[in-house]
Curated annotation (Swiss-Prot):
<feature type="binding site">
    <location>
        <position position="435"/>
    </location>
    <ligand>
        <name>D-galactose 6-phosphate</name>
    </ligand>
</feature>
<dbReference type="GO" id="GO:0033920">
    <property type="term" value="F:6-phospho-beta-galactosidase activity"/>
</dbReference>
<feature type="binding site">
    <location>
        <position position="297"/>
    </location>
    <ligand>
        <name>D-galactose 6-phosphate</name>
    </ligand>
</feature>
<dbReference type="InterPro" id="IPR017853">
    <property type="entry name" value="Glycoside_hydrolase_SF"/>
</dbReference>
<protein>
    <recommendedName>
        <fullName>6-phospho-beta-galactosidase</fullName>
        <ecNumber>3.2.1.85</ecNumber>
    </recommendedName>
</protein>
<feature type="binding site">
    <location>
        <position position="437"/>
    </location>
    <ligand>
        <name>D-galactose 6-phosphate</name>
    </ligand>
</feature>
<dbReference type="GO" id="GO:0005829">
    <property type="term" value="C:cytosol"/>
</dbReference>
<comment type="similarity">
    <text>Belongs to the glycosyl hydrolase 1 family.</text>
</comment>
<feature type="active site" description="Proton donor">
    <location>
        <position position="160"/>
    </location>
</feature>
<feature type="binding site">
    <location>
        <position position="428"/>
    </location>
    <ligand>
        <name>D-galactose 6-phosphate</name>
    </ligand>
</feature>
<comment type="pathway">
    <text>Carbohydrate metabolism; lactose degradation; D-galactose 6-phosphate and beta-D-glucose from lactose 6-phosphate: step 1/1.</text>
</comment>
<dbReference type="InterPro" id="IPR033132">
    <property type="entry name" value="Glyco_hydro_1_N_CS"/>
</dbReference>
<feature type="active site" description="Nucleophile">
    <location>
        <position position="375"/>
    </location>
</feature>
<feature type="binding site">
    <location>
        <position position="116"/>
    </location>
    <ligand>
        <name>D-galactose 6-phosphate</name>
    </ligand>
</feature>
<feature type="binding site">
    <location>
        <position position="160"/>
    </location>
    <ligand>
        <name>D-galactose 6-phosphate</name>
    </ligand>
</feature>
<feature type="binding site">
    <location>
        <position position="159"/>
    </location>
    <ligand>
        <name>D-galactose 6-phosphate</name>
    </ligand>
</feature>
<dbReference type="InterPro" id="IPR005928">
    <property type="entry name" value="6P-beta-galactosidase"/>
</dbReference>
Amino acid sequence: MTKTLPKDFIFGGATAAYQAEGATHTDGKGPVAWDKYLEDNYWYTAEPASDFYNRYPVDLKLAEEYGVNGIRISIAWSRIFPTGYGQVNVKGVEFYHNLFAECHKRHVEPFVTLHHFDTPEALHSNGDFLNRENIEHFVDYAAFCFEEFPEVNYWTTFNEIGPIGDGQYLVGKFPPGIQYDLAKVFQSHHNMMVSHARAVKLYKEKGYKGEIGVVHALPTKYPLDHENPADVRAAELEDIIHNKFILDATYLGHYSEKTLAGVEAILAANGGSLDLREEDFTALEAAKDLNDFLGINYYMSDWMEAFDGETEIIHNGKGEKGSSKYQIKGIGRRVAPDYVPRTDWDWIIYPQGLYDQIMRVKKDYPNYKKIYITENGLGYKDEFVDNTVYDDGRIDYVKQHLEVLSDAIADGANVKGYFIWSLMDVFSWSNGYEKRYGLFYVDFETQERYPKKSAHWYKKVAETQIID
């Protein structure tokens, strides 16, 4: 049976400042940790990325032409405050005013994120969000943006608090490149959630007319063997690291006994302790019912089995299928069932996981209000032929995920929109330019845009709300 989505559903496209803008040192923009980290550790940089800094009118015109009525944009913190605080960079402020005006001119609603992996270098080098001073700097930055940009109707504080901590302190593929430090992972999650809560409370106290929420990456975790208690426990602990800890902070205003017991077990196996303060929970409690929406980024699920050995994580950054490895002491090991497809980067394709995660939020956190799927898409080594890409695999991937959204809505979940990652091809943090996600192919040499087959398909779905 053909499935449909509501008439008022937003069909969006997602971007991020550092992955799209380029112009990393232009017009007074301050440095971010990624600038030097990429030069030192990778075979690419974020210059010029998709040159969105100069070509956003082209991308927004394409968005309008192809039925995309919402766009995720992030503000580069160091474009506004080059060192994270203090002196304002007027040219950076002007750029975002112009960008938001172009969005509205093209009838593409901007959903604006304050922090998308790009803390200014001056703050990152003094501990990033492990340093509580930077909570204050973030709240001040948020306050400035809320006041300066009244044309923004939808704000999100952070993009993917979970993967920031994981990338920086567990996998070690994000600056500062620390591996296997679970205490730092949880402390980063916690301090960022406190920053989120304080920004949300400030926004509501000031009486701004828009909406505010947070974007969490929520990969669903399953036990490899549902009958094996050790596998079930491995999935529970993995879920706490990536999902439950931050969801509890967002919607409970504290960590449940089960969550805290899991954290204690993880730290007992891996070492370290957390600094959780009374004033932190006061802030979390004050904001738990103030979130207007939850953004869910969903790409994949994971299956976990029990594991007794030492921690080892190997990141598949070059699309060599089967080269990744993920096992954590005291938690478990990721093992993909044979029947589940995966991408060249070992990302498991499992649309049911999105449905299960949405229904989990609905059940466990009934104060969630509404959900947007703020990222979902297929990374692919696109083949450019006849001035396009025949990306049937991407179409199939998105179609399957839209279908489970239709199911979730039918089953009572309040899902209001979907943002494909990504609007156009952008630079990928730990994969460079080979891994493409866009509806529009970008020739990174010429910066020309070309609609892929998926862009034409997405336009039809957006216009009809029929998933076909």
